[in-house]
């Protein structure tokens, strides 16, 4: 059998922040190599599967020797000789090696690297998106992070991501051009305002601003400056990542302390004044009441996205669906740790009528598998940073390649 695994080998490589991460090679009996690199987040939910790090002094505690050893030891011992194309069996075999509920012994970073490498080895020179598709496929609308704050930037801006959403176009290449032109337009807008400084982890600009709402104003100015119509051709999405500024006494934003209800009213005022189509993590990861209140009031006019709320976990998603906490979910492979579990959560969300957004992490690599997964699952949306820095453009460029054979651009918003 050509897809039987002959070897699995893990190694340490560097991610886009210069931190160690895991890379895995899976070689099958016919000589096919599947290689995958694992991303890492900065604003992580506490309910995520465990990213196994070494601690100690080397690599500032961020080494991955333990995770790599688990790839080359127990995982390789369990999987060599198995059929790489049996994705569900492969992933289940890895999970059976770990007795914890959150992959804390083997590490989600070890498992995910192997899971993705096996998928790549199975497909070989073929297309991953076609391999996983059930017949429906489309190029996703990109949510392009052009202004960074929060944990992704060294600035005073609380909101983590201000994204442009080029939904009003007939094709992905047109949409990508619009988003990229707006990115460059924002550079000019910020330079004119004397605010052009560094960039954040995901390639977006990271200015200091007097209020978070100023970020919305500058993004709208960039959209119009590039010659596009806000709200019709290009809209705005936010990742508030509010868990990062939630403290015991409330949400600390714009120099104020707010309750969940008050914060929700602030968002409502932004929805009134700006072409916002999506808000991610508007409340803390366990502030279920605020989520429900806001979604009931505003879910008819904005996509309310759970990231830290759900952490790509089917149990948390099931609870959110039951109580109406949101109407969309962000999907991050490393939050759950295997390809199989990721696909299950996507299917579960779609069955509930939820929007699905396939996402990168702030600590990224040149791996572009999320592009294929977003197309093959017909997710409709992808979030993969600014159209700058090769760790981000790798995903956009892969979508360009795929669009040569899949010319349906998702109809969103």
Residue spans for each PLM region:
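Conserved phosphate/anionic-ligand binding catalytic regions in large, soluble enzymes, centered on
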Residues: 13-15, 24, 100-122, 141-158, ...
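Catalytic core of soluble alpha/beta enzymes
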Residues: 213-413
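Structural signal for hydrophobic packing residues in well-ordered secondary-structure cores
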Residues: 28-30, 72, 76-83, 94, ...
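Active-site-proximal beta-alpha loop/turn segments in soluble metabolic enzymes
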Residues: 161-172, 196-212, 241-254
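Mobile "lid/hinge" segments at catalytic clefts and subdomain interfaces of large enzymes
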Residues: 137-200
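Metal- or metallocofactor-binding catalytic centers and their adjacent structured scaffolds
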Residues: 39-127, 131-132, 176, 204
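Short beta-strand elements
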Residues: 22-29, 36-40, 144-166, 221, ...
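Short, Gly/Pro- and small/polar-rich lid/capping loops
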Residues: 1-22
């Amino acid at each position: 059998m050509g897809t039987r695994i002959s070897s699995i080998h893990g190694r340490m490589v560097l991610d886009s922040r210069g931190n160690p991460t895991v890379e895995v090679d899976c070689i099958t009996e016919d000589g096919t190599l599947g290689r995958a690199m694992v991303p890492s987040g900065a604003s992580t939910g506490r309910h995520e599967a465990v990213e196994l790090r070494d601690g100690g002094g080397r690599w500032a505690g961020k080494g991955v020797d333990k995770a790599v050893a688990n790839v080359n030891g127990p995982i390789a011992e369990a999987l060599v000789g198995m059929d790489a194309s049996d994705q569900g069996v492969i992933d289940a075999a890895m999970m059976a090696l770990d007795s914890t509920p959150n992959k804390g012994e083997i590490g989600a970073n070890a498992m995910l690297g192997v899971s993705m490498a096996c998928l790549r080895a199975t497909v070989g020179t073929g297309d991953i998106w076609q391999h996983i598709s059930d017949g429906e496929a489309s190029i996703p609308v990109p949510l392009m992070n052009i202004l960074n704050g929060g944990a992704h930037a060294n600035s005073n801006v609380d909101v983590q991501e201000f994204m442009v959403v080029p939904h009003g176009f007939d094709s992905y290449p047109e949409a990508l051009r619009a988003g990229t032109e707006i990115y460059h337009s924002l550079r000019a807008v910020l330079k004119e305002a004397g605010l052009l400084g560094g960039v954040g982890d995901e390639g977006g600009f990271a200015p200091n601003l007097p209020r978070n709402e100023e970020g919305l104003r500058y993004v709208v100015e960039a959209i119009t400056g590039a010659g596009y119509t806000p709200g019709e051709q290009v809209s705005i999405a936010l990742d508030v990542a509010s868990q990062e500024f939630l403290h015991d006494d409330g949400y600390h934003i714009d120099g104020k302390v707010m309750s969940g209800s008050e914060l929700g009213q602030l968002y409502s005022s932004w929805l009134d004044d700006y072409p916002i189509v999506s808000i991610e993590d508007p409340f803390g990861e366990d502030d279920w009441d605020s989520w429900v209140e806001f979604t009931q009031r505003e879910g008819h006019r904005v996509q309310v996205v759970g990231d830290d709320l759900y952490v790509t976990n089917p149990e948390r998603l099931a609870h959110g669906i039951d109580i109406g906490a949101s109407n969309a979910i962000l999907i991050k492979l490393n939050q759950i740790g295997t390809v199989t579990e990721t696909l299950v959560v996507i299917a579960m969300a779609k069955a509930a009528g939820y929007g699905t957004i396939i996402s990168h992490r702030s600590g990224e690599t040149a791996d572009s598998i999320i592009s294929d997964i977003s197309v093959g699952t017909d997710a409709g949306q992808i979030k993969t940073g600014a159209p700058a820095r090769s760790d981000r453009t790798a995903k956009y460029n892969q979508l360009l390649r795929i669009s040569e054979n899949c010319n349906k651009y998702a109809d969103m918003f």
